Amino acid sequence: DSTNTV
């Protein structure tokens, strides 16, 4: 799974 925060 991948987590992206911007």
UniProtKB/Swiss-Prot annotation:
One of its GO terms (molecular function) is dextransucrase activity. Optimum pH is 5.0. Its EC number is 2.4.1.5. It catalyses: [(1->6)-alpha-D-glucosyl](n) + sucrose = [(1->6)-alpha-D-glucosyl](n+1) + D-fructose. It is an enzyme of class 2 (transferase). Keywords: Glycosyltransferase, Transferase. Optimum temperature is 35 degrees Celsius. Disulfide bonds: none annotated. It comes from the Bacteria. Belongs to the glycosyl hydrolase 70 family. Involved in the production of dextran, an extracellular glucan polymer. Synthesizes water-soluble glucans (alpha 1,6-glucose). This is Dextransucrase. The lineage of its organism: Bacteria, Bacillati, Bacillota, Bacilli, Lactobacillales.
